[in-house]
Amino acid sequence: PSVIRDELLIKVQAADAGDMRAVRDAIRERRDWATAKLARYQRLRARLLDGRSEEDYLARAERIGPYLTLIRGISFEEDNIRWAEHALAVIARRLPTTDADSDAGDSRLVGPATNG
C-alpha cells in the first residue's frame, strides 16, 4: 500500500508514554496473525503453481493478476513479521529483566546472556 494507516502503529508511536507491555502484546498478536496469513498465502501459491516454476506459470497461465496480487501479499506479510520481530526485540531490551509479564521461554524476546 502507498499509505499505511494502522491502529497498531499509532500505539507503537505512543508506546513511550503508555503501556509498553500492552504494545508488546499487540505486536505479538499482529506477528502471529501475519504468520498464519503468510502460511495460507504460501499454500495458495503452491496450489496455483501446481508443481510448475514461477517462470513457467507466469509464461503460460491464462490469468496472472491473481498471482501477482498474491506475491504482493506474501511480501507484505513477510515484511510485517520482520518488523514485528525487530520491534519485539527492541522492546524486550527496554523492559526490565524482572518483568513478570515477560516470556522467558520465547527465544524471540530474550536478549543476549550476561554473566554477572
Predicted regions and their residues:
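Long amphipathic alpha-helical coiled-coil segments
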Residues: E85-D106
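Long, low-complexity, intrinsically disordered segments
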Residues: R108-G116
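Acidic interhelical loop/turn segments
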Residues: L44-L68
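Amphipathic alpha-helical dimerization/coiled-coil segments
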Residues: P1-R43
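Heptad-repeat amphipathic alpha-helical coiled-coil interaction surface used
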Residues: R24, R31, L38, R45, ...
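Amphipathic alpha-helical interaction segments
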Residues: E7, T69-R72
